Amino acid sequence: MTQVAKSTDTDLKNAVILELSWLPSIDSSHIGVTADHGAITLTGEVHSYPEKVAAGKAALRVKGVHALAQETSVHTKWTSRTDTDIAREAGEALERAVNVPDTVKATVAGRVITLTGEATWHYQSTAAAWAVHTIKGVVGVHDRVQIRSGAVLADVKASIQAALVRNARFEGDYITVMTDSGGGITLEGVVRSPGERHQAELVAWSAPGITSITNNLTIQY
């Protein structure tokens, strides 16, 4: 029987460095990478918030990565842009976004955008964060939008479970769904990568009436 050796922390670190170097949207020359039992920490500097997001996603794509600590700081060249400039542009971006309700608002402090208000669906909150994260001068986005509690369908547990099984990205049979009366969902079970873990959460968010998700899925390569 052939055995496949697990990646060491050194192997994992080198793989993440190569992945960061591979992407033209990331300047990896100022990003530090450390690995500790499958957990990756990114440090150093990036030039924009979208670059920071991209670096985090790239690290999580690497096989063997179980968790990520994103500690890079954004050193933007747009230092002349004030919080007022960013707030004005954020308001315009939210107004243009067709998937963002009028109840979502943006405030800015220290070039960090904080989104507040209410949305009916999780995808609307995600759309709001996506709409503002590329604004010049932004160094961070905090999504504090609350999802309105709705009537959870009696068969929502079965519906989510069926959707997980249908999804070709992972083995949905290994995921258990639990619900509570307040619209909360808990995911338990085993997946093969951080990407699968995230995808399972996205599938669950698609159910009506979901207000929160506790993702307890563990990763086994």
Summary of predicted features, one role per range:
Residues 1-221:
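N-terminal targeting leaders
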